[in-house]
């Protein structure tokens, strides 16, 4: 029955027949179960979060590094969740698992490298890393094929035309949107974006790539009170330029390279509906999601 429901759900989304996201069948409760190649460079303990815990209480002054190490945001740091806590926090100062150089970028001035095995993104200028960030990637049945893409449109305040915020009629926010792929699906077109969203610490989207956007979380969910994690904004400004207007613009932006596979049993997770995570379905490549 679960397989049938999952299949029907997938078909409905791809054909644009449903207006609400499919519910998550299983949400990961232990991020210790997810293994990254760089995990083995550090000594860490699996710690179960209690109702009194905060990122600062668990990770100390390097709480942002601790969240990045777990590829999660503050909204998902909840009681009952198990997280990886490095025994020596100084070892993950300014945590970054991406290589300092990407020599395969050729003559491309800017490249966005998305390593799904690490669930991390690196921004490169002429092969040199200038910025990195944890990401939320697609679950198996929605995940894009590894390969080369290119940012062809930007939209500062992009919103979903397919899904509303859960429990409301307000469109899902996909702020700081960088569109990097459009493909024909049935009678429509599906678009994929890099944009701000929730980061639960495991694959959770319908194909888009998500980064920290605590300004969006405060606006739509009322927390955190003081936005600090703003990787989506940083990447957008780097890719689109400081002078980019707020409306949808066609551009020839950075090359996007997707590689690797998340190291998690695919049956454990389904798309999570509490974030702007679904690709767009439109009637032509010019129509934004």
Predicted regions span which residues?
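Bacterial N-terminal signal peptides
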Residues: 7-16
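Structural motif
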Residues: 81-83
């Amino acid at each position: 029955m679960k397989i049938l429901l999952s299949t029907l759900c997938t078909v409905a989304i791809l054909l644009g027949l449903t207006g609400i996201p499919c519910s998550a069948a299983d949400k990961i409760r232990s991020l210790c179960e997810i293994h990254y190649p760089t995990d083995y460079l550090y000594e860490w303990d699996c710690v179960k979060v209690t109702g009194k815990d905060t990122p600062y209480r668990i990770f100390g002054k390097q709480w942002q590094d601790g969240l990045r190490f777990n590829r999660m945001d503050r909204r998902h740091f909840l009681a009952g969740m198990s997280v990886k806590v490095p025994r020596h926090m100084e070892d993950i100062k300014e945590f970054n698992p991406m290589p300092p150089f990407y020599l395969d970028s050729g003559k491309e001035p800017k490249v966005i490298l998305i390593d799904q095995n690490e669930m991390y993104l690196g921004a490169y200028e002429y092969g040199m890393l200038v910025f990195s960030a944890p990401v939320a990637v697609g679950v198996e049945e929605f995940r894009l094929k590894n390969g080369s893409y290119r940012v062809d449109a930007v939209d500062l305040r992009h919103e979903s035309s397919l899904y509303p915020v859960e429990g409301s009629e307000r469109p899902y926010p996909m702020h700081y949107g960088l569109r990097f792929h459009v493909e024909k699906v049935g009678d429509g077109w599906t678009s994929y974006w890099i944009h701000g969203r929730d980061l639960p610490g495991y694959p959770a989207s319908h194909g888009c790539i998500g980064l920290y956007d605590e300004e969006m979380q405060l606006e739509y969910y009322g927390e955190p009170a003081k936005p600090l994690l703003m990787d989506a904004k940083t990447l957008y400004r780097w890719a689109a330029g400081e002078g980019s207007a707020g409306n949808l613009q066609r551009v020839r932006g950075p090359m996007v390279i997707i590689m690797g596979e998340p190291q998690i049993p695919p049956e454990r997770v389904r798309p999570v509906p509490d974030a702007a995570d679904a690709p767009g379905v439109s009637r032509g490549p010019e129509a934004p999601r």
